[in-house]
Amino acid sequence: MGNNVVVLGTQWGDEGKGKIVDLLTERAKYVVRYQGGHNAGHTLVINGEKTVLHLIPSGILRENVTSIIGNGVVLSPSALMKEMKELEDRGIPVRERLLLSEACPLILDYHVALDNAREKARGAKAIGTTGRGIGPAYEDKVARRGLRVGDLFDKETFAEKLKEVMEYHNFQLVNYYKAEAVDYQKVLDDTMAVADILTSMVVDVSDLLDQARQRGDFVMFEGAQGTLLDIDHGTYPYVTSSNTTAGGVATGSGLGPRYVDYVLGILKAYSTRVGAGPFPTELFDETGEFLCKQGNEYGATTGRRRRTGWLDTVAVRRAVQLNSLSGFCLTKLDVLDGLKEVKLCVAYRMPDGREVTTTPLAADDWKGVEPIYETMPGWSESTFGVKDRSGLPQAALNYIKRIEELTGVPIDIISTGPDRTETMILRDPFDA
């Protein structure tokens, strides 16, 4: 029996985590976000109604679930208020279902200004951030000058700390980036206007999770972005600013690391990436266009067209190692319907001619890397909405089996459409 289940992306994000978290929370009492910020974009489709969440955990739509934003998440008060209002306008009582860690760093207007000023200054070498202030907020946290949710309990001290940190950042904005200064009074007024709402949701998350563990409650930890965007283990510097791997669960929520029972890796049946950075299996031909169109590969947060390519099992094996994956959930299998053949990257050819089956680390080391493919027959039959494994074409079953063989991890869940009902649960993580 797995009480603490982690759901995370095994690629570069956009694997379809939100739907799976929402589906599995039928049995959960708590859903916890432990890293990232409102740069995430989790799309849920329930009874045909689409909901996109960026900051609030995907369990918020269920009345039996308490959603928690852990200390590893950088929290934008304005983004949270906007998201809360959208949900409350639809009759969802967010304030009754959402709790926050007081250790969450705040994202304020000057973080956004810095993020955008830096990307502009980088020009052609831009990282491709979402421009939401995520990186600068994490920088402030590590530099120990960041303001946190808990600082809002003492409004007078908060105002003093804010003045100090804004003088520092405005100096950089004006003198180095030649950008406009951010108005201190506006930031203070905007934050004070929502301070009481934020502090009313504060709880000791680590203690709450430990009590839940002792009671035997089911807890779901919801990852954002994907393994290959991890600040330490991803394609640095083309990465996000947090630990997207399973190790981030303990540090970003306060759960003891030995208490993680099952790690579910969400695996898209092909590969996508947003923004700059290495992508060995990227396709620039009509197949790449087909995957983009069929998969509706446009970012939920930015609306940017995603880069598309074949599934890279070399990179996925790295995700298996980093996360000690228990099982996969394979998503978007239906996007491959109609292709005459499908390919799996099984190794890389390095610039010096060597064949390797492990990924390079730094982005520069990926230069000149060529994918080595295994080609399999495709299938013409539709897999969309199929709810039983026996209803899948043999060629699709062969593709699934080969992924399991190449990665050494079982596919426990298969998703065949965006709705939560269009799913085959072969092994429930909470029963594993």
UniProtKB/Swiss-Prot annotation:
It catalyses: IMP + L-aspartate + GTP = N(6)-(1,2-dicarboxyethyl)-AMP + GDP + phosphate + 2 H(+). GTP binds at residues 13-19, 41-43, 306, 332-334, 415-417. Pathway: Purine metabolism; AMP biosynthesis via de novo pathway; AMP from IMP: step 1/2. Mg(2+) binds at D14, G41. Keywords: Cytoplasm, GTP-binding, Ligase, Magnesium, Metal-binding, Nucleotide-binding, Purine biosynthesis. Binds 1 Mg(2+) ion per subunit. Substrate binds at A300, T301, T302, G303, R304, R305, R306. It comes from Salmonella typhimurium (strain LT2 / SGSC1412 / ATCC 700720). PANTHER family: ADENYLOSUCCINATE SYNTHETASE (PTHR11846:SF0). This is Adenylosuccinate synthetase. CDD domains: AdSS (cd03108). Its cofactor is Mg(2+). Its EC number is 6.3.4.4. It is found in: Cytoplasm. One of its GO terms (cellular component) is cytoplasm. GO terms for molecular function: adenylosuccinate synthase activity; GTP binding; magnesium ion binding. Pfam families: Adenylsucc_synt.
